[in-house]
């Protein structure tokens, strides 16, 4: 009986002390912004489907720089060219990092590539490797035959549609063109020609893209991970990670097969496997590093048609008109 009584008397004292300590804690000087609710902040006030419009309206009310409280994460939003230049150019090193979000960290093998990796010595060395061996002008030029071939294939398809008076969906064609070129350059395969593999490929891509943009509440309120588990997000993320890891491993094993039929020019996986055996760099590349880089290419090989830019379609139409008139 004595212990519950002591707890009843001491807990309120500790609670009041905690509240007083929070009040005494000096708040950081942040730009103005909408008031949020305790713990969740402004999360309930934002709708991802119309987020750009909401941020635009907030900038009209609070100015070109304002703050949001996303759970326990403080966020600064800028909406003017002058401030964007300050952040992205003049102070790019200070703002070069990305927040560590669960799906991105999991699917990128804890930031083992250069997109989700924090700015540090590892990132700088990986960037040097990519610039020198993967994205160099010589390497890009070596894939010109692939680009020319795939563009010819697209023109043939458009010509076939035109001769049969069929409707041409430029968005689908451009998505297919981009996806095929990246896959051939990165993996050495043309998944558009393979029935079951094509279905598996696009299924993995769709799930990867969805998970990358899925809201995990534990990313913003750390002690709420159980909510993500109840919603099945952790199981879904783990399942997709294992399926992708299996896919990456199949690609690597295929390239390491001594009996593999080589098409001629090395693809990106061939280059990465060579770099793995090269000990002249300050970091030792592992298979996880290679898989992390493959994830970036894998993700970039697909663009959802609903997000496809109208501007790109206009440029493509203009390019086709130039070909027709010349």
Report residues per predicted region.
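Hydrophobic alpha-helical signal peptides and transmembrane signal-/tail-anchor segments
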Residues: 4, 133, 318-321
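Cytochrome P450 substrate-recognition site 1
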Residues: 25-146, 170, 174-184, 197-225
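Terminal signal-anchor or tail-anchor transmembrane helices
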Residues: 1-26, 180
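Short hydrophobic/aromatic segments of transmembrane alpha-helices and their interfaces
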Residues: 7, 66-69, 124, 286-290, ...
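Hydrophobic transmembrane alpha-helices
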Residues: 2-3, 18-21, 45, 59, ...
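Cytochrome P450 heme-thiolate monooxygenase catalytic core
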Residues: 99-107, 141-311, 318-326
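Short hydrophobic alpha-helical segments that form membrane-spanning helices or hydrophobic packing faces
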Residues: 39-46, 87-88, 305-314, 324-326
